[in-house]
Amino acid sequence: MDELRIDLRNATSEEIAQGVKDAQLCFKLNHTMPYTDEYDDLVQKLFGEFGESSRLMTPTTVVRGKNVKIGKRVVIMNNSLFMSAGGITIEDDVLVAANAQLISNNHAP
């Protein structure tokens, strides 16, 4: 498997725009009442896949959320961090503890 390195000095305009969009979605999600349609809609927009009956407790930080796939009946507790340039998959029936950091990218030296 090739190692994916992130070099922010060479980011494309599309990558920058997606980063801004993800940051804004995270901010809005972190300030939205949970268990509402608006909250659920923001979660669906932020992640690549978000399974049925799964819950995300805020606050959270998500970078490149479209690379994150969450299975069914997953609970992610508060203060989670997803840095997902290399992709992150959480399968069905998983509990992610509070303050968990899921990181699949590397930075250029």
Mark where each language-model region is.
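Terminal amphipathic alpha-helical/low-complexity segments used for targeting or macromolecular assembly
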Residues: 1-53
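Flexible, glycine/small-residue-enriched loop-and-beta-strand segment within the central core
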Residues: 37, 60-70, 75-109
